[in-house]
């Protein structure tokens, strides 16, 4: 078994020039050629940013609606009340509630990928913050998931909204599609993501903003990208 895995990886590595930082177009082409799993692998971008997340003014966080989605069916939960619950249901939310939903979450219900809430429901959401937070599900105004425009937020989530946040080491990871996507769709999704991250560059960040960049599939080695080309995307 180990020998098979080694041979598979060896074959994949042979397709990559390790000392080369690929341009976006060629990088996408190479990463698609690495698809070898028996399922439709996710394409992921990893960026190392020149920020220090220990400083609040250098925390890069936001959301982007990818033009071609992620290829994943997203289940959305909404905390709202009265007419806003109706708006959520009409927009296609999978789970809608208030205190009752918070109780279900306390009892172990986590069958959704994104949580949206109206501002007046954040006190209720706060009761399950210790459960949602570590899973990256806590609603936040910066990602458009705390809003009165519930219909738009649900629509964005269903259309392929990706929420991202720099980690403690300055890295951002985000899915931008599936291996089965045409190259052009993966490229356009990546450009939209990078454009959004570039717009969020903190004014206090010094030096090179995107230090390193890579593209990979769920089961593949990573392909290095030209960080300067990505920084030039506006």
UniProtKB/Swiss-Prot annotation:
Keywords carried by this UniProt record: Antibiotic, Antimicrobial, Repressor, Ribonucleoprotein, Ribosomal protein, RNA-binding, rRNA-binding, Translation regulation, tRNA-binding
MF GO annotations: rRNA binding; structural constituent of ribosome; tRNA binding
InterPro entries documented for this protein: Ribosom_uL1_bac-type, Ribosomal_uL1, Ribosomal_uL1-like, Ribosomal_uL1/biogenesis, Ribosomal_uL1_3-a/b-sand, Ribosomal_uL1_CS
GO terms of biological process kind: defense response to bacterium; regulation of translation; translation
UniProt KW Nucleotide-binding keyword: no
Pfam families associated with the record: Ribosomal_L1
Presence of the UniProt keyword Transport in the record: no
GO CC annotations on file: cytosolic large ribosomal subunit
Record-linked NCBIfam families: rplA_bact (TIGR01169)
Assembly: Part of the 50S ribosomal subunit.
UniProt xrefs under PANTHER family: 54S RIBOSOMAL PROTEIN L1, MITOCHONDRIAL, LARGE RIBOSOMAL SUBUNIT PROTEIN UL1M
Miscellaneous comment text of the record: The antimicrobial peptide HP (2-20) forms a short alpha-helix. Increasing the amphiphilicity of the helix increases its antimicrobial activities.
Function: Binds directly to 23S rRNA. The L1 stalk is quite mobile in the ribosome, and is involved in E site tRNA release.
Family under the similarity heading: Belongs to the universal ribosomal protein uL1 family.
Entry protein name: Large ribosomal subunit protein uL1
Gene: rplA
């Amino acid at each position: 078994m180990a020998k098979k895995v080694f041979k598979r990886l060896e074959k994949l590595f042979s397709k990559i020039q390790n000392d080369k930082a690929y341009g976006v177009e060629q990088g996408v082409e190479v990463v698609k050629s690495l698809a070898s799993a028996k399922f439709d692998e996710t394409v992921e971008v990893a960026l190392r940013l020149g920020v220090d997340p220990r400083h609040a003014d250098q925390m890069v966080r936001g959301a982007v609606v990818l033009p071609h989605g992620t290829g994943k069916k997203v289940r959305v939960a909404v905390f709202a009340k009265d007419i806003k619950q109706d708006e959520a249901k009409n927009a296609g939310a999978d789970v809608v509630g208030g205190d009752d939903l918070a109780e279900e979450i306390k009892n172990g219900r986590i069958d959704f990928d994104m949580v949206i809430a109206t501002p007046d429901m954040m006190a209720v959401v706060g009761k399950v913050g210790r459960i949602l937070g570590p899973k990256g599900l806590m609603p936040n105004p910066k990602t458009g998931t705390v809003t009165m425009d519930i219909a738009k937020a649900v629509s964005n989530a269903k259309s392929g909204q990706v929420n991202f946040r720099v980690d403690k080491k300055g890295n951002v990871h985000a899915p931008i599609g599936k291996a089965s996507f045409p190259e052009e769709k993966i490229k356009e999704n990546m450009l939209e993501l990078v454009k959004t991250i570039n717009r969020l560059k903190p004014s206090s960040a010094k030096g090179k903003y995107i230090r390193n960049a890579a593209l990979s599939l769920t089961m593949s080695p990573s392909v290095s990208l030209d960080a300067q080309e990505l920084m030039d995307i506006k």
